[in-house]
């Protein structure tokens, strides 16, 4: 068997985001063939992937992007069948807590039902891939004890947290019931230069830098 035949294949949802772009780089460095699912509306916000997308030795060779939506099971299933990944990293979804109060149905459709759709699809594949779901500390709401762990009760206080709690528990159920290799990673706030500027921590950092440079006088 050649080295090319041994190459692992991974599929990333949410690849245009902070974590997805870093994960794509990591997997490529490890020798993976990396496929990413992007929304049509993400076509103008791929700056985190520009260095990969513009490299002819990477894009189309070891790195591929596919248009699909978590709300569109037909297209999503076609991508899964075509790519036949060994590993799926599910990072996509509506991830803004404040916005989830304004668009709760969309938040639940993408974050909760979208995860369920993926689980249903992969359990029907001849060789179900390993599945990782990026959960969130928002599933715990306002816990009385610090720090939390896997046994901390779910008590979300916003639509995003509720959607993530549903998705997280469905991963557990599908692992126990159908024997899938499916796991959750409970994510807390984490920062990088690639984090979206609409998050409060990025706003604070940018304002602090602007104050230092004399471009503004106070945090905005």
Regions found by a protein language model. Name each.
Residues 170-173, 203, 207:
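Generic recognition of well-ordered alpha-helical segments
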Residues 1-190:
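N-terminal Rossmann-like NAD(P)+-binding domain of SDR-like oxidoreductases, especially those catalyzing
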Residues 165, 190-206, 212-218:
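Glycine/proline-rich active-site loop of Rossmann-fold NAD(P)-dependent oxidoreductases
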């Amino acid at each position: 068997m050649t080295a090319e035949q041994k190459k692992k294949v991974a599929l990333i949802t949410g690849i245009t985001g902070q974590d997805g772009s870093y994960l794509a780089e990591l997997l490529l460095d490890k020798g993976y063939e990396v496929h990413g699912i992007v929304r049509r509306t993400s076509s103008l916000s791929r700056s985190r992937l520009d260095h990969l997308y513009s490299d002819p030795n990477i894009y189309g060779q070891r790195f591929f992007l596919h248009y699909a939506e978590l709300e569109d099971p037909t297209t999503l299933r076609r991508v899964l069948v075509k790519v036949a990944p060994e590993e799926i990293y599910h990072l996509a979804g509506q991830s803004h807590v404040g916005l989830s109060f304004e668009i709760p149905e969309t938040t639940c459709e993408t974050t909760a039902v979208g995860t369920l759709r993926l689980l249903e699809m992969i359990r029907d594949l001849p060789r179900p891939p390993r599945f990782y779901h990026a959960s969130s500390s928002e599933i715990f709401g306002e816990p009385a004890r610090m720090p939390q762990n896997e046994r901390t009760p779910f008590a979300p206080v916003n639509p995003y947290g509720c959607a993530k709690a549903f998705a997280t528990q469905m991963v557990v159920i599908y692992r126990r019931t159908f024997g899938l290799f499916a796991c959750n990673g409970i994510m807390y706030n984490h920062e990088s230069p690639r984090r979206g500027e609409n998050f409060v921590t990025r706003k604070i950092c940018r304002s602090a830098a602007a104050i230092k440079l004399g471009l503004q006088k106070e945090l905005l």
